[in-house]
Amino acid sequence: MITTRFAPSPTGFLHVGNIRTALINWLYARHHHGRFVLRIDDTDSERSTEEYTQAIRADLAWLNLNPDVEYSQSKRSELYEIRFESLKAKGRIYPCYETPQELDLKRRIAIGRGLPPIYDRAALNLTIEERSELEEKGIKPHWRFRLDHDHAIKWNDLIRGEQRFDPKLLSDPVIRRADGSWLYLLPSVIDDIDMEITTIVRGEDHVSNTATQIQMFQALEAELPEFAHMALLTGGDAKISKRFGADSVADFKADHIEPIALEALLARIGTSDPVEVLTDLAPLVENFDFSHFSRAPARFDMAELKHLNARILHITPYEQVADRLPEAMDAHSWEVIRPNIDDLSEAAFWWSVVKEDIAKPDLSAEDKAYLVEAMAIAKTLDWSSNPWKEWIDILKKQSGRKGKALFLPLRLALTGQSHGPDMAGLLSLIGHEKAIKRLEQAVK
């Protein structure tokens, strides 16, 4: 069974790049009728918080990307210890004693000599006695995974195609700190094996991590999953990450963005497929295909999202928004108002225009005289059906007005606004009695 995972660290709120990663993993799993796993990567105990964990769950629920199962790495340390010891017994993990300052000096010297700034494996040359002396001085080791330099690292990426790394050009990665806490790389591999993750989908900034993790999979004698590395999103001139203040779910909610609008855009930018106006995720699931993804950076444009949000609302059925509309606003009212709104908050505004008192418009004497004429005609019409077209036709003939001069004074008098939803529809909501009252108020 195809199984994907979304593995955020609860050290901050999800940003748009995280949301895209979660979405693509969810879509791929659902396309193959597989499983979508949420794994909270909370090994960083100092920065991980329950508040952020709860926010991640809430954000995924808002996006309708509900996982089939959830795990927390903080509850899995026993398994990590077992695998750590097995790799140590195989000689694939070794202790190192350099301080951060010493490592930084080594990097700067290597760069100065025109060499790759990778770890020189000096710790492998320490004797047992030298290690004991260092530890007797109170120096606790951190631990590195020893890369196999004899075999090139290769995989066929679902997006990037054939990938090849020379392990000699990579540093043996630190996998455990001196205080015993875990870094990202090894627990991630252990969990991917244990959770039977078949496909790892993430940003292209993880490509070098994948190279080292492939050797960890092999050292643990596990079958390799497939990998798909997406081009990073860009917003303006910089890649998007939570450390650069990119939009979070809270920001999108504050901007009244519909979840489906965000998902419809994120699923298609950076692919050869057009962004579609959708009201549910089904078409994105059905048509999902990694072969349509580009290696070029994908630009996330907030203006494009807001435009898409409006277009989606214009076709959204009443049933999908009824619980978020003003009380007593029915399906007919929604159909009248929805073609003219950019976000759902505007529905409440137009409902108030229909149901509540409006400000008296500032009109010229000429327009007031025109409205007196309009009111007289309105009182003669049959309001059992919508009289708007008949009303306008008569006014046009009798007044000689046309275009803006014909329509705008009526709109101002009846709604207090210079633009908005179609007046025929609005008039059906305002009704005969209120329409006459507003015309009377406007000409006073």
Swiss-Prot record:
InterPro entries: aa-tRNA-synth_I_cd-bd (IPR045462), aa-tRNA-synth_I_codon-bd_sub2 (IPR020751), aa-tRNA-synth_I_CS (IPR001412), aa_tRNA-synth_I_cd-bd_sf (IPR008925), Glu-tRNA-ligase_bac/mito (IPR004527), Glu/Gln-tRNA-synth (IPR000924), Glu/Gln-tRNA-synth_Ib_cat-dom (IPR020058), GluQ/Sye (IPR049940). It is an enzyme of class 6 (ligase). The keyword Transmembrane does not apply. One of its GO terms (cellular component) is cytoplasm. Its main location: cytoplasm. A motif ('KMSKS' region) lies at residues 239-243. GO terms for biological process: glutamyl-tRNA aminoacylation. GO terms for molecular function: ATP binding; glutamate-tRNA ligase activity; tRNA binding. A motif ('HIGH' region) lies at residues 8-18. It is found in: Cytoplasm. The keyword Protein biosynthesis applies. Its EC number is 6.1.1.17. ATP binds at K242. Catalyzes the attachment of glutamate to tRNA(Glu) in a two-step reaction: glutamate is first activated by ATP to form Glu-AMP and then transferred to the acceptor end of tRNA(Glu). Monomer. Belongs to the class-I aminoacyl-tRNA synthetase family. Glutamate--tRNA ligase type 1 subfamily. This is Glutamate--tRNA ligase 1. The gene is gltX1.
